[in-house]
């Protein structure tokens, strides 16, 4: 056990944290995860890999923590002495960041600084490698298409602004202290583990529910927003690859293919056997079930962002050339996988 690498994951109960923990355990790591104390259980994504800590074979351990508590983070890093830290924890919902901008900055921006400072204060600069979950939202009002590691940033939300600070403080600690610290600028990545407040999961869950008669209408904001969507399982492998390099760096992970929310909706409903036809314009536009004539998709202005990000498209050339990373799952296959999982869940047949 003592010869195994040790990893610490903040945000372990989220989509990426769950897939990453699974990957690291498969690679032979001892994995420590940080989870927040919550009023409801939020560990369902990792229950299948959790082991009782008294089990002599246990390699996965959970610690209560919070990115807003520096002494807590310092204690966890000191206790675990990780070879690699994956900082995935964040208030990661763009719309919510407009409602909780101060908390978002505290957790996402200063939280990253707290983790870096823990490494520095504990004298782990030459032992611990650091991965920071950056985001394509940094590009915001995109200055060029596609976006790569050299594209100027133009954040358009409190979330993106907080992540911009986190990005640059990682670069600063890398240059100032020689820390092996890397930013993964990940474009949108989804999966059946995606939270239901995110648009892709909202769409697939609604398509499944409507097809089963459990929901009437799916309400969305900007149907023409375009995103570069990939599969989260493939993206967490890219995170791990960054920490295996001799030299740290910043990498875009993306598919290089853009898809509109509208098209994602059509694919999701197609997987349930429904065909969507669009009528009307602007906020009056509706998606109609071609077979029944019923409205199943409608626009709700409340879901429009105060400052919209219309088009994000990533260029992952550097990741392909340096890391050997590639995406494999098409966005259509991803949408279908998510719908099938939601159908199984709603029917009560999910394993």
From Swiss-Prot:
Catalytic activity: GDP-alpha-D-mannose = GDP-4-dehydro-alpha-D-rhamnose + H2O
Pathway annotation from the record: Nucleotide-sugar biosynthesis; GDP-L-fucose biosynthesis via de novo pathway; GDP-L-fucose from GDP-alpha-D-mannose: step 1/2
Keyword Calcium tagged: no
Signal peptide from the UniProt entry: none
Keywords: Lyase, NADP, Nodulation, Plasmid
Enzyme class: lyase
EC number(s) given by UniProt: 4.2.1.47
GO term, biological process aspect, one: 'de novo' GDP-L-fucose biosynthetic process
Gene Ontology MF annotations: GDP-mannose 4,6-dehydratase activity; NADP+ binding
Family: Belongs to the NAD(P)-dependent epimerase/dehydratase family. GDP-mannose 4,6-dehydratase subfamily.
Protein name per its UniProtKB record: GDP-mannose 4,6-dehydratase
Organism: Sinorhizobium fredii (strain HH103)
């Amino acid at each position: 056990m003592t010869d195994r690498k040790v990893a610490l994951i903040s945000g372990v109960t989220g989509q990426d944290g769950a897939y990453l923990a699974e990957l690291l355990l498969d690679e032979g790591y001892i994995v420590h995860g940080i989870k927040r104390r919550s009023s409801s259980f939020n560990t369902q994504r990792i229950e299948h890999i959790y082991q009782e800590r008294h089990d002599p074979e246990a390699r996965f351990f959970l610690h209560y923590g919070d990115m807003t508590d520096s002494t807590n983070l310092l204690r966890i890093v000191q206790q675990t002495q990780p070879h690699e830290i994956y900082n995935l924890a964040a208030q990661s919902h763009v719309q919510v960041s407009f409602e909780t901008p101060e908390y978002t900055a505290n957790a996402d921006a200063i939280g990253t600084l707290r983790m870096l400072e823990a490494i520095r204060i504990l004298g782990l600069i030459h032992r611990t490698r650091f991965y920071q979950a950056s985001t394509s939202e940094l590009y915001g009002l995109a200055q060029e298409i596609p976006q790569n590691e050299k594209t100027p940033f133009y954040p358009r939300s409190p979330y993106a602004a907080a992540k911009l600070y986190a990005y640059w403080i990682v670069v600063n600690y890398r240059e100032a202290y020689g820390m092996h610290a890397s930013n993964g600028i990940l474009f949108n990545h989804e999966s059946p583990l995606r939270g239901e407040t995110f648009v892709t999961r909202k769409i697939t869950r609604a398509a499944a529910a409507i097809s089963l008669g459990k929901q009437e209408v799916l309400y969305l904001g900007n149907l023409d927003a375009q995103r570069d969507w990939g599969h989260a399982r493939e993206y967490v492998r890219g995170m791990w690859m960054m920490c295996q390099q001799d030299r740290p760096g910043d990498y875009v992970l993306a598919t290089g293919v853009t898809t509109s929310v509208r098209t994602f909706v059509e694919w999701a409903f197609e997987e349930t056997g429904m065909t969507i036809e669009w009528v009307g314009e602007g906020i009056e536009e509706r998606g109609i079930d071609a077979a029944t004539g019923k409205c199943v998709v409608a626009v709700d202005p409340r879901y429009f962002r105060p400052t919209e990000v219309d088009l994000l498209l990533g260029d992952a050339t550097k990741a392909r050339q340096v890391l050997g990373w590639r995406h494999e799952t098409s966005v259509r296959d991803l949408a279908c996988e998510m719908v099938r999982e939601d159908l199984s869940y709603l029917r009560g047949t999910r394993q």
